[in-house]
Amino acid sequence: VKTITKLRILYPIWTVISIFSLLYAPTLASESTLFKIGQLGQIIVQLFQIAIALLLYKLFMETDKEQASLIAIFGLLGVPFSLMAILIPDAIHLAEVFWGLWLIPIGTLVIKSGMFPKWIGYFLYIGSLGYFGATISFFLIGSVPAFVDYFTVGELIWVLWITFMGAKEIQN
């Protein structure tokens, strides 16, 4: 199965489980079973993250191996911090640094590859600012302003494009 097909399957599952485990399940701390399902969801999301980081490397390595390597490196480095956040919730802000970093080479390669509309790459850059803004806000003021989340919509646009539109074939 082609790399893009695998991404089209994994990305939406990753997104749905992420939304449930990061946004919804933590509000259910009083419902122990649902809370634990949310924690399990976070573990599953990180397993998907590993696969997606490696698939994105494979997808973009012909375009620019160095930038593709950065996708894999940053995508994988965020995993331990994300897992740590299951036990220490504030660790999520350390993971956000790597989430922001990984969107930069993805954005660069989206623009450079010709497989996707360039504007998506620019939205991914903006998304990286959202993650950096969340981390900086947390450490400087102790909370994350709600508007910072809107910056990360670029990542959602990327996931939706991959899922529904796929990638253009590049002729060598």
Residue ranges, per PLM feature:
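Hydrophobic, aromatic-enriched alpha-helical segments typical of multi-pass transmembrane helices
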Residues: 1-172
